[in-house]
């Protein structure tokens, strides 16, 4: 039975070494990037968001080493930049935490935090969240998962931030590479109480819930066959590999220019040009 307080993918977290440089890179790729946010002191992190509907991407960087960001720092040290964790939307984080506890996963949290937000009219407000994590050791495909309850959606989904020159509209898939995709997919499906779905090329998908993006687990070789002509240099053998983004493909092609590679009926940014994250723009 699916979790009642956890619905599908809320956002993908791309861990980066230099936050400001990463934001500039994503602007060059045609994304509208939010002003920089600084999280509560115990988090020790800062971010930029790239807002879609109903989901988003987060560029996350460590500003001050803290106990809370130790796993993120360890990830950067081991893997370099890339998709470090995936957030689900939480309806109620306290109840969601109890739901996963009942399924044998002691939750980390709930944790409350916030960050100041400069609104389009120049006023300063706050984005407030309550999150909980599955145990950090439970990382299917090498990617941690957590759930995020948005207390102030109006300071996160700001209309001016949701229009992108590259035509990006929403996340369609989170691509995860692994030597044994079926085992990793089964691990995730158990954690979120969902079913797996076998795909024609041997990849295994896990719907995240609702109408949100799917997880797709596949080998690096399978990923290469899905996106011929796209260099996968820099991707780990096991970990978050990329995001499939529903978009206006013509707008993406124009905005990306030489950074984009025409492949699989869309236009693709190789991971080396996307801070360790392959970005595949496909027809919305």
Segments and roles (model prediction):
Residues 2-9, 14-34, 52-112, 119-284:
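Glyoxalase I/VOC metalloenzyme domain signal
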């Amino acid at each position: 039975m699916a979790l009642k307080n956890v619905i599908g993918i809320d956002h993908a977290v791309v861990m980066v070494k230099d936050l400001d440089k990463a934001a500039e890179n994503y602007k060059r790729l045609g994304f509208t990037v939010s002003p920089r946010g600084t999280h509560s002191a115990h988090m020790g992190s800062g971010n930029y968001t790239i807002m879609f509907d109903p989901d988003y991407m987060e560029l996350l960087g460590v500003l001050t080493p803290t106990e809370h960001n130790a796993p993120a720092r360890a990830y950067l040290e081991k893997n370099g930049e890339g998709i470090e964790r995936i957030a689900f939307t939480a309806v109620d984080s306290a109840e969601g935490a109890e739901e996963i506890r009942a399924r044998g996963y002691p939750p980390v949290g709930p944790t409350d935090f916030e960050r100041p937000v400069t609104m389009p009219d120049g006023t300063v407000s706050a984005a407030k969240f309550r999150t909980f994590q599955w145990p950090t050791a439970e990382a299917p495909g090498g990617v941690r998962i957590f759930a995020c309850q948005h207390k102030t959606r109006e300071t996160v989904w700001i209309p001016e931030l949701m229009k992108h020159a590259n035509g990006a509209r929403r996340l369609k898939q989170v691509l995860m590479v692994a030597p044994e995709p079926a085992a990793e997919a089964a691990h995730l499906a158990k954690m979120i109480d969902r079913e797996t779905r076998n795909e024609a090329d041997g990849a295994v998908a896990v719907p995240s819930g609702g109408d949100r993006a799917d997880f797709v687990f596949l080998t690096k070789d399978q990923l290469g066959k899905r996106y011929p002509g796209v260099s996968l240099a820099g991707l780990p053998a096991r970990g978050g590999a990329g995001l499939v983004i529903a978009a206006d493909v013509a707008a993406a092609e124009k905005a990306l220019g030489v950074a984009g590679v025409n492949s699989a009926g869309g236009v693709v940014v190789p991971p080396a040009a996307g801070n360790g994250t392959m970005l595949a723009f496909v027809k919305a």
